[in-house]
């Protein structure tokens, strides 16, 4: 398994890990042949492929790689091609908009995107359905609830502090931490409670700072654009990370203006993220055309980008950060004004 570095990525990896281990045990196959490692981005890179192929070669094993909550994008094509060139079987389980070239390199692909482009059906949920078909008794419905809450899915119900705990642990883990490490931690109630408490404290502190560094722009009578400087409250050594911090900003303003269509744009030196609430989506706002236009107009400035209709991100070249931010703000205002 190769899984993304947040709760949805971890839970989707855990679903496949647990089911594959249970299957191996039943078939009297070596369970230690099932393992997994975190990927600290949405891109499966050539370096990731090299590490996986070498790891399998050194163990004298044929390799199959299951990638969860990442890898179905154009930026991952080189890494996926490296896997295929080595004779590796490739499966991707994801809920992000897929790239045709990436899919062409997969032996199997499981996604919710054709019937849900909002991303509400998380990778954790899709992986759960795959896990049930591998070994039904090992699939864990509780992990699905964690992933739905963490990704702010409209399918989420209930309150699961474990979701915050896994997001916190993933943020501070080593870049390629093993899936076994998470498998142990999700059974450690004390560890999860501690991580949850630390996550909440970090979020409270970050929101307090960001409220002082966010501006609001009225668009028409029913829409607001919130622009927040995420660098004021986030860093590699603090929690929450930028995406989670922007969620806090979005939630805060949605609570203040419950009848408004609200889009939040959070930026730092090298990235910009978008969040849109249900009213904005219902009015027709979609982040993907905004990002597609940026890629077309400023290809030299955009390193990578994509996401869902209501939550997306672009990585930018630092020297072009300001110009990308200004253009994105214009595109969002234009999109909201049309609705």
PLM regions and their residue ranges:
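Flexible glycine/proline-rich, aromatic-decorated loop/lid segments
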Residues: 91-92, 96-109, 290-299
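Predominant activation on well-ordered alpha-helical scaffold segments within soluble catalytic domains
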Residues: 13-17, 50, 124-132, 243-250, ...
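A structured phosphate/pyrophosphate-recognition subdomain
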Residues: 1, 5-6, 102-241, 249-257, ...
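Hydrophobic/aromatic beta-strand patches that form the interior of the parallel beta-sheet core
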Residues: 66, 89-93, 108-110, 263-265
């Amino acid at each position: 398994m190769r899984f993304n570095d947040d709760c949805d990525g971890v839970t989707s990896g855990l679903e496949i890990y647990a089911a594959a281990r249970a299957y191996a045990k039943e078939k009297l196959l070596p369970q230690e042949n099932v393992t997994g490692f975190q990927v600290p981005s949405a891109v499966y890179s050539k370096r990731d492929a090299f590490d996986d192929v070498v790891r399998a070669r050194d163990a004298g094993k044929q390799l199959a790689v299951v990638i969860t909550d990442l890898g179905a994008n154009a930026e991952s094509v080189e890494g996926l091609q490296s896997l295929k060139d080595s004779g590796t079987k490739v499966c991707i389980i994801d809920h992000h908009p897929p790239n045709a070239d990436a899919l062409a390199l997969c032996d199997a692909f499981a996604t919710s995107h054709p019937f849900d482009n909002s991303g509400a059906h998380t990778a954790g949920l899709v992986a759960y359905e795959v896990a049930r078909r591998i070994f039904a008794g090992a699939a864990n419905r509780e992990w699905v609830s964690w992933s739905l809450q963490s990704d702010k899915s409209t399918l989420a119900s209930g309150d699961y502090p474990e979701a915050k705990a896994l997001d916190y642990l993933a943020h501070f883990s080593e870049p390629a931490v093993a899936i076994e490490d998470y498998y142990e931690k999700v059974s450690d109630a004390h560890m999860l409670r501690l991580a949850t408490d630390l996550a909440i404290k970090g979020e409270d502190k970050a929101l307090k700072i960001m409220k002082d560094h966010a501006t609001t722009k009225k668009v028409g009578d029913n829409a607001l654009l919130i622009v927040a400087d995420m660098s004021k409250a986030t860093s590699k050594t603090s929690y929450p990370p930028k995406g989670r911090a922007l969620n806090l900003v979005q939630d805060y303003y949605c609570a203040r203006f419950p009848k408004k269509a609200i889009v939040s744009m959070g930026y730092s030196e090298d990235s910009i993220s978008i969040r849109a609430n249900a009213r904005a989506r219902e009015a027709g706002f979609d982040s993907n055309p905004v990002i597609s236009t940026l890629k077309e107009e400023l290809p030299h400035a955009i390193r990578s980008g994509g996401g869902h209709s209501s939550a997306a991100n672009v990585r930018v070249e630092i020297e072009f950060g300001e110009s990308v931010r200004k253009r994105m703000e214009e595109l969002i205002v234009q999109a909201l004004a049309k609705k």
